[in-house]
Design a protein with these regions (language model features):
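Conserved class I S-adenosyl-L-methionine
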Residues: 2-6, 11-60, 64-73, 76, 158-185
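Class I SAM-dependent methyltransferase SAM/SAH-binding core
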Residues: 74-117
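A conserved beta-strand element that flanks and buttresses the S-adenosyl-L-methionine
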Residues: 129
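A short glycine-rich, Lys/Arg-flanked "PGG" loop and its adjoining helix->strand segment in the class I
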Residues: 143-155
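Short alpha-helix
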Residues: 183-197
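Conserved Class I S-adenosyl-L-methionine
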Residues: 202-264
Length: 264
């Protein structure tokens, strides 16, 4: 009976979504990730300068563009874009977590959920950035976002989905790698959702060369810098740190790769 039911593609897809929802809550929803863009290459001026330069060229971002960054963290990317292009319109970020250690310059950050922001504002945008954030929204939240954002973008607007590439070179310990692989698999479902609602125009990779000491990287793991580390027990973190110590050199050199997909 179950085999017959699963032959129905619509039902099978619903099962996949249900599984993905369980995965999201298991991996990500216990607490917000405060440290992903703090005190690491992920928050360095060089990192955001290189990403900003590539986005400006790839998306042809000009000074009159109106930009929204969903889940902007401390606003480093928006700030860099604003400085590089001298934007006429102050770019806007939406971030539910308020970071008291950071005062943004030349940008406006709203501390709320993206759906609350869209409900309470009538602003129109030319560019919407979704950098490693969609997996943190539930399916219902994403559905509402896909519906509501269409009322807040101009005719030729671009929606930019930026996510970790599945060929990552980031140093991992086994449990961390297992959880990350599960997370990366969910990107396919997110892409299906986006292509159901928007048209995929183009894509390319952003490659950043990282040089960091082993001790600095271990401290990032202790701070649970990735969402997949959030629900690990302290013992699991310490065991992971021992694995990294025993399997990597004192100076880490690797490439951090993001995939940039542009929808319209």
């Amino acid at each position: 009976m179950i085999k017959k039911v699963l032959k129905n593609n619509n039902y099978k897809k619903k099962c996949e979504y249900f599984f993905c929802e369980l995965l999201y809550f298991a991996l990500f929803m216990n607490s917000p990730c405060y440290n992903w863009d703090r005190s690491s290459w992920l928050s360095s001026k060089e990192y955001f300068q290189e990403l900003s330069n590539q986005l400006i060229d790839f998306l042809d971002i000009t000074e009159e563009k109106k930009i929204l960054d969903v889940g902007c963290g401390r606003g480093h990317l928006l700030e860099t874009l604003a400085l590089n292009i001298n934007l006429i319109n102050q770019p806007v970020g939406v971030e539910p977590v308020k970071h008291d250690d950071f005062i943004p310059q030349n940008i406006k950050i709203f501390h709320s959920s993206v759906n609350s922001f869209l409900n309470e504002n009538n602003s129109q945008f030319d560019l919407v950035i979704l950098k490693q954030v969609l997996h943190l929204l539930t399916l219902d939240e994403r559905k509402k976002f896909y519906h509501d954002i269409k009322n807040h973008i101009n005719e030729d607007a671009c929606i930019v989905f930026i996510h970790m590439n599945d060929q990552t070179e980031i140093p991992l310990f086994p449990l961390m790698e297992n959880k990350l692989n599960q997370s990366l698999k969910s990107h396919q479902l997110l892409l299906e959702e986006l292509t159901d609602n928007f048209h995929l125009m183009k894509f390319e990779n952003f490659n950043y060369n990282v040089k960091i000491s082993l001790e600095e990287y271990l401290e990032m793991i202790r701070n649970r810098y990735m969402t997949v580390l959030l629900d690990l027990k302290e013992k699991e973190i310490e065991e992971g740190i021992e694995f990294i110590k025993n399997n990597y050199s004192n100076q880490l050199v690797f490439q951090d790769t993001l995939t940039i997909k542009v929808f319209n």
